[in-house]
Amino acid sequence: MAFHEIKVNDLNENVFNLIGKDWFLISAEKEGTVNTMTVAWATVGILWQKNVVMVAVRPERYTKEFLDASDTFSLTVFDKSYKKMLGYCGTVSGRDEDKIAKSNLTINH
């Protein structure tokens, strides 16, 4: 699967399905290392004429350290064939193993 950026205004998918049923990854970088986790809780909307997404991340999650340390993060949507990988990335901590490598994911900046 090739990586390509999708502008939010070009998104033709049902965001409720993307968030609640299909899930997605949130990833951030800290000190040259990237961590990711599966997200199934989020809201999307418009705030002060800007498109926004708010993602719920528990304070004790390892990924939160990366989000707090970074000015940016990415949200990545996958097709249904990646559901098993998304389940894995949502249950295993990056503190314990390299989820990105074990999932055969590629980081693209």
Residue ranges: model-predicted function:
Residues 1-109:
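Active-site-proximal mixed secondary-structure blocks
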